[in-house]
From Swiss-Prot:
One of its GO terms (molecular function) is damaged DNA binding. The gene is recA. This is Protein RecA. It is found in: Cytoplasm. Pfam families: RecA (PF00154), RecA_C (PF21096). It comes from Clostridium acetobutylicum (strain ATCC 824 / DSM 792 / JCM 1419 / IAM 19013 / LMG 5710 / NBRC 13948 / NRRL B-527 / VKM B-1787 / 2291 / W).
Amino acid sequence: MDNEKLKAIDAAMSQIEKQFGKGAIMKLGEQDILNIDAISTGCLSLDIALGIGGVPRGRVVEIYGPESSGKTTVALHILAEAQKKGGAAAFIDAEHALDPQYARALGVDIDNLVVSQPDTGEQALEIAEALVRSGAIDVIVVDSVAALVPKAEIEGEMGDSHVGLQARLMSQALRKLTGSINKSKCIAIFINQLREKVGIMFGNPETTPGGRALKFYASVRMDIRKIDTIKQGEEMIGNRVRVKVVKNKVAPPFKQAEFDIMYNEGISREGNIVDVGVKENIIQKSGAWFSYGDIRLGQGRENAKLFFKENIDIRSEVENKIREKYDLPIQKVKNEKPKIEKGTENNTK
């Protein structure tokens, strides 16, 4: 490109920046755009599947799946990781179902978590917009899109038809929110449920409520499913879960991650490190025995998990070796998250 054209472009860009502010226009190769900052999900295999070490800042993320598959659990882990980095987090509880005890057990600082339980879908999305525009929130979770009921539906009679109201509401909200989310580097996580299309004979009958807008605006979409129940003798102690990254605008999509969600504990970090460590040949498995170099971790996966729980330094060493292999940020040794108080109901959200 000749110098005259370059000068004209620079002059135009300078004029646009004066009129609309710094960051209104830029060249794509500028360094601060190329590096996409991410917040960890608290699950090593999911961070690897997402390709950038977590969920991207300044983007919309959708987590959807059947009931009790672990959607809220994954979202709460992301909130906890954001708070550990010194960030502020907000939770729009449209379902009115947030369990503070469970959130605390997952590592969420509930004393500093901003929570809203809105009456209508419009109110929920206006609160979300105000929080995003403040520029102070790092992660905001909306739980769930299906529970964002338009005001007209709440004030109307039971049985009244309100076709397309929720879809229009979501479309309008996302048009307004996307720019603010990007500028403030906030992560907006929308949790969504599943519905079935009526009369579908071929293809996948499953769909998510709230219209198509969220599918378009989301940079990352995660489909989370329970694939097995974890038992200790006859007692059920958790779920084995598979997450498929069905859309990813910041890394290659369609990668999968499997991990354990233990009741009252959340994602099993130790179990995840054992699984990924064996896959990457950092942990050796011989018969039922697991070992790391000359260190015997235990006989059976549960004993290996127990060893890592009791030896945090070795667990962190193994985790960081895996992270180095995938060019993910190195984790510092942290204290264990608090245990949930006795008497709290067993539940995987």
